[in-house]
UniProtKB/Swiss-Prot annotation:
Residues 36-94 form the VWFC domain. Belongs to the fibrillar collagen family. Residues 1-26 form the signal peptide. This is Collagen alpha-1(II) chain. Residues 27-186, 1247-1492 form a propeptide. Glycans are attached at N1393. The C-terminal propeptide, also known as COLFI domain, have crucial roles in tissue growth and repair by controlling both the intracellular assembly of procollagen molecules and the extracellular assembly of collagen fibrils. It binds a calcium ion which is essential for its function. Residues 1258-1492 form the Fibrillar collagen NC1 domain. The gene is col2a1. InterPro entries: Collagen, Collagen_superfamily, Fib_collagen_C, VWF_dom. Disulfide bonds join C1288-C1320, C1328-C1490, C1398-C1443.
Amino acid sequence: MFSFVDSRTLVLFAATQVILLAVVRCQDEEDVLATGSCVQHGQRYSDKDVWKPEPCQICVCDTGNVLCDEIICEDPKDCPNAEIPFGECCPICPTEQSSTSSGQGVLKGQKGEPGDIKDVVGPKGPPGPQGPSGEQGPRGDRGDKGEKGAPGPRGRDGEPGTPGNPGPVGPPGPPGPPGLGGNFAAQMTGGFDEKAGGAQMGVMQGPMGPMGPRGPPGPTGAPGPQGFQGNPGEPGEPGAGGPMGPRGPPGPAGKPGDDGEAGKPGKSGERGPPGPQGARGFPGTPGLPGVKGHRGYPGLDGSKGEAGAAGAKGEGGATGEAGSPGPMGPRGLPGERGRPGASGAAGARGNDGLPGPAGPPGPVGPAGAPGFPGAPGSKGEAGPTGARGPEGAQGPRGESGTPGSPGPAGASGNPGTDGIPGAKGSSGAPGIAGAPGFPGPRGPPGPQGATGPLGPKGQTGDPGVAGFKGEHGPKGEIGSAGPQGAPGPAGEEGKRGARGEPGAAGPLGPPGERGAPGNRGFPGQDGLAGPKGAPGERGVPGLGGPKGANGDPGRPGEPGLPGARGLTGRPGDAGPQGKVGPSGASGEDGRPGPPGPQGARGQPGVMGFPGPKGANGEPGKAGEKGLLGAPGLRGLPGKDGETGAQGPNGPAGPAGERGEQGPPGPSGFQGLPGPPGSPGEGGKPGDQGVPGEAGAPGLVGPRGERGFPGERGSSGPQGLQGPRGLPGTPGTDGPKGATGPSGPNGAQGPPGLQGMPGERGAAGISGPKGDRGDTGEKGPEGAPGKDGSRGLTGPIGPPGPSGPNGEKGESGPSGPAGIVGARGAPGDRGETGPPGPAGFAGPPGADGQAGLKGDQGESGQKGDAGAPGPQGPSGAPGPQGPTGVNGPKGARGAQGPPGATGFPGAAGRVGPPGPNGNPGPSGAPGSAGKEGPKGARGDAGPTGRAGDPGLQGPAGVPGEKGESGEDGPSGPDGPPGPQGLSGQRGIVGLPGQRGERGFPGLPGPSGEPGKQGGPGSAGDRGPPGPVGPPGLTGPAGEPGREGNAGSDGPPGRDGATGIKGDRGETGPLGAPGAPGAPGAPGPVGPTGKQGDRGESGPQGPLGPSGPAGARGLPGPQGPRGDKGEAGEAGERGQKGHRGFTGLQGLPGPPGTAGDQGASGPAGPGGPRGPPGPVGPSGKDGSNGLPGPIGPPGPRGRGGETGPAGPPGQPGPPGPPGPPGPGIDMSAFAGLSQPEKGPDPMRYMRADQASSSVPQRDVDVEATLKSLNNQIESIRSPDGTKKNPARTCRDLKLCHPEWKSGDYWIDPNQGCTVDAIKVFCNMETGETCVYPNPSKIPKKNWWSAKGKEKKHIWFGETINGGFQFSYGDDSSAPNTANIQMTFLRLLSTDATQNITYHCKNSIAFMDEASGNLKKAVLLQGSNDVEIRAEGNSRFTYNALEDGCKKHTGKWSKTVIEYRTQKTSRLPIVDIAPMDIGGADQEFGVDIGPVCFL
């Protein structure tokens, strides 16, 4: 791909990236940008910028200073009817000729209409000196259309046009009188300013108005007003302009030279003095068709045009003679299906289908190929004579003449008379596609197509960046009080701001409506005792006594119902940026916006298929009768002489017989469109010609021209103009849409874009004989020769020598449309040509099918700040609100009312295209704008990158106040404004509707659970307290549903003229202009047409078949064949490129249940349970095996004397011996086998101490028991401080019979020192952590200063308040928080109760209004706000609600919040709203937070 990109394109691309980066960097560093720039009326100007804020004032920005000067006008002398052109300062005399040509004396007027100069063409002047660059002027007010002025001064040389067809030779005329030009001050004094962009002429190009009929030449315009003294330009080298000589005779055609290599660009020449207006240059030869460009981006929808009245269908004219190819007809309906033809060659690429779903933006593609030639631009100056073109291709082979040696080409014969059209031949087989021909002449535009249905609505774009803050408008008068509006929903409360200074008293509001009767007052005091009367007789009961004195006044009654709403204060200054609220749900589709401005021209659409044969055209007008030439005698043929020099053209001879059709000559340059010819007389239809032989496939042609623009889409809603996104990759081809119905015939438009030749139209009525036309298509067959045997195809012959130039025939009448040529193969990419002029917008394309609505995309990253958008019109002055003093900076505020409408921000970056929405209803057509002044023609440049955003325009003049419109729909929530000045305390408003449930509040610390109080009896309604001060602004609530659209307000007056904008897009197609003056003589034309066919020679003998010739050049395009039969299925194509990722599919149906998975690996061992209860004693065990023999015991005491032994053998009696020694037990120490003899120690055991062995057994048993208990306590902890459990759930599992109570847990395990004491609910297994402290004392905590009520955070805002904490005082700080972090991880549910004790304070439901607007907010431990209403995940419930109204008695509301997001609990803060009055008190019991 890289090899195809011209290196210059890369350099240009790199440069644009650098510039773009620089621009972005400058936007980020506004202080750098501002150095040297100036600001006037809110508009920023760059250094050295020049502008005219008023017609008679001109200003310049000089390194940060604005220097303005008044324009001093000279009185026009001897001018009774001096005029001041619209938007100008000084009067001009319409008839006075300007005598200055230097540009320094008098400013030139606007460019006049072209003068009617019949035969005058002045000589081209030498180039003038280069002037310094001028500054871009502001856009002037639109002037009234002046009378037609004399020709303006010569403009700057335009780009050389591509050579047109040679025009007829006009006699050289004298130069025309110099006319008064437009305001060329910037041009004359400074040339072009590099910064001025496309608006270098100081005139904004408006849309092209309809061209009127050519008027008579106007009187010469008066000299323009005095211009500023320009800096003198460097002196140019004046060339002596000689007069133009008469045209010389055409020289003989030279051989075409080889193309030279492109030279390096020369240095810019110095600017010459302006020459007289040059003649219009010829249109250049259309380039060969290029390769099809990438699919263009869809243009913005244009505004809907008014449907023209349907024209009456004319009567069909008689069939005329086949003319030269006509303009392309409108696309017709598809014909009936033809018989299947033989398999044809590969066809041209088909139309692109309907747009596929939008893909993500692709990378920036390479520069596209040049587009088709646009519609004719305004008249350019004559370009330099182009180089001689190469010789044309060889024509088709002529019929065999009498054999002979070819003689040199003779001079052109006199024109012959037209032959009778031959009968239509039968259709030949389709030939192989020839090489692409030059594009045919531009056809007239087709009738206005039917407006397509409104396109689907796109997704909402990213919000634009906020614009610069506008200047403060003038202070408006205080408006009359509006009608009382319905009470708005109460905003959510913000956090408390610092206390503000008291504001000045505002004006008294209108009296409120009569309040409801107050409660009955207390009885008055007893009156004084009357004097005691004398006792009388008991009388009859007397009449009632006199009325007693009035008692003391009772307590004041409750305030009455709210009075009417006071005047709206003016919006406060913008507050700090609030926290971003959650994304609201998508609103309903808004009404269609007004038509957007005309978008940039889209890239051309693909060329449509040729339409069917058009209807017969109306007969043309009769052409002027030509002069009869003197009849020449036909001479006998002489011998072939050598070619003589070109003689002068002889007089026209008499009409000869119609010669045989010569081969087509080389293509001439495209001529200017001729005037419509007179209608021809009806000719017979010509026979279809014999199809030519199939030509060899042509070489790959050069890249084709840009395709026709697609049809104009209907007007879409006005979008914010974003910077141009990267081009997306082309979507896949969709199915071909059905052809729409033909619209009514529109008025004749100017020549449309270059079309491919259409099919041959029906012949028109034959007109009177015109002058000789261009070479026609091949005529009927000549005198029949004998059929020769068909020779083999010969080789391509070399190009023949150029023939002598023939006389240029007059333009013939336009013939019917020619046939459509086959599409050529794409050629190699040509070098980048000069930018063509901008084409007109094409007709609208067919609407794409509506795409599925895509899922809501994730929010994109915030884009770079766009440049400020254009200044919107100032709104009507609002009523003046009372001025208060600034309040202290508040904490988080509630959602403010919608702010005043800001100026539109600049467009943000374009997001990826959303899927098409459903079509919206048609918008009302906008009113027609005023006709703008005709802009000077700019040179068409290549498609530039998206321009940098323009500077912000100055604020418009405030319009008159319009009538009040109906209430509009609620605007989107604006960013919260800053705290406004406190107003005077207003009348209590009606209760608002129940608001949406808010976000969860911050978690508060929990307290010990209070005992459940019995419900108190409802007290009487107490008097309302004074209104509290404004609370802090709460976070933005969820967006409300979109209101109904209000009716449109009356249109405001036109604003003041804005500053001149950047160059506008090319306007819509104007009406056809008057024909221009004849052009200057063109360069020497190429070879002339072939002379008349000679008479048939005598029939020669049939020659032998020649050898096979090389393949001939492709023949001319044959007539369109019948539709072929469907071809055989082609071979399977190569695999296409990978498609783009499709849209997210809908979720599939649930799948079937999977097979049972394999058993997972065994989990890790659970924590050791608590020790079990001591079991009952076991049964006695059986005797164990005997142990080993123990060590020898201590020496025993001496034994008792043993019993006397049996009598011994009688011996000699001796004396008794002494006691024997003790037994040495060491002798038995080694014995361990008792079976070998009796246990030697068995007699000793009874002697040992009885306590030694049992004591040892007890110690071992105790140790074992202790170890067993420890192991059991690890396996089954008992919830003591020494042996804490991990959670209460573990305790419940190990000891299900235990009762609820306080236990110790250690969720993070490890050392037990940081265990915490909690309440275990053994019914549920919940672990409940106590708050510390667990109560907020009951008292009046807050005294409000203002009348607005807001939520006041207890721990963050209230003096003496605190955030709730949890755990035991005895633990180290943060211990409970750490353990709760682990506890949250071990739990899936959390719950907490808060009891709000109230006295004249609403906690949840406001019984008076029936809504939850005054409900308290809670703050969770992860800073989320928990509310009474709104998103169900962040809302709490009220288990008991005794704080519904003000009764003057203490009551309570029990709030419960349950969640599976354990990170939201515990509650750490509470924010009541209904507090601040002297009689409003509250207290809070914080319940424990429980995890399960």
